[in-house]
Regions:
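Juxtamembrane regions of bacterial inner-membrane/periplasmic proteins
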Residues: 2-252
Length: 252
């Protein structure tokens, strides 16, 4: 009896795994086409449009695609300093480096908040929570392009697989180019060019180091936590931290 239970349990688990593999093969996105074709939309953009409709608001999408050569090196450095300092050397996953960098950021931000008399040093998530959510640029792009915000084992597994193939199929420059053109920089603002025009009335190619660090500072959550209108001190503190790291990051 016990042997039969073990047998059927094993077959059941095997069936689930095989079913998941078949589903992945059928629904897996075509990563290779991103080498030469810019994505027309992303899962995140579509989710934001649906959210606006559900609220009864007019959906907004302001986005202008520009090649990486027309995005300021300052912004490239700032984004890597803020989001993924080892982007050029890792293969999609770099949790240890992110943890070390964020621990240092926590210490510096808390110190500066105290000096400014702002008792909001807890604006940076506690390390255990942050570590679970930390992502490299490649991981962020995988989620942004193809996945929902659902938190589940299968979604994280799919994110890991897509990240692996993004790194295998695309160059680092192409990954960074797509990332900088699709990420959200405010309500309905997508991509570096739209963000530059919205915040500074200039092209993304003309951004100064300080302006670039400002845009990088709001990436984690431009609508609430790092909204420059609602939380200017938080944005300014993160901006300063990013500016300190910009000279040391390597761009692809």
């Amino acid at each position: 009896m016990l042997r039969r239970i073990i047998k059927y349990t094993f077959l059941g688990l095997l069936g689930i795994v095989l079913g998941w593999i078949i589903f992945e093969l059928i629904t897996f996105p075509n990563i290779s086409q991103l080498r030469d074709h810019n994505p027309e939309t992303t899962s995140m953009i579509e989710a934001r449009l649906r959210e606006a409709q559900e609220r009864g608001d007019q959906p907004k999408r302001i986005q202008t695609w520009v090649p990486l050569e027309k995005i300021s090196v300052n912004l490239q450095r700032a984004v890597l300093a803020g989001e993924d300092t080892n982007f050029t050397s890792h293969h999609g996953f770099d949790y240890e480096a992110i943890q070390k960098a964020w621990e240092e950021a926590q210490r510096e931000a808390a110190k500066e908040a105290k000096e400014e008399g702002d008792d909001q040093s807890s604006w940076i998530p506690a390390m255990p929570s942050f570590k679970r959510g930390a992502s490299t640029i490649s991981q962020q792009l995988a989620k942004n392009l193809f996945l929902s915000s659902e938190k589940s084992f299968f979604r994280k597994g799919r994110e890991a697989v897509i990240t692996y193939f993004l790194e295998r199929k695309l160059s680092k420059r192409r990954i960074l180019e797509i990332y900088l053109n699709v990420i959200e920089w405010g309500d309905g603002i997508y991509g570096a060019e739209a963000a530059s025009q919205y915040y500074f009335k200039k092209s993304a190619s003309e951004l100064s180091a300080r302006e670039a660090a400002f845009l990088s500072a709001i990436i984690p959550n431009p609508n609430t936590v790092f909204n420059p209108q609602k939380n200017p001190k938080r944005v300014a503190r993160r901006q300063r931290i990013i500016m300190r790291g910009m000279p040391y990051v390597k761009i692809p």
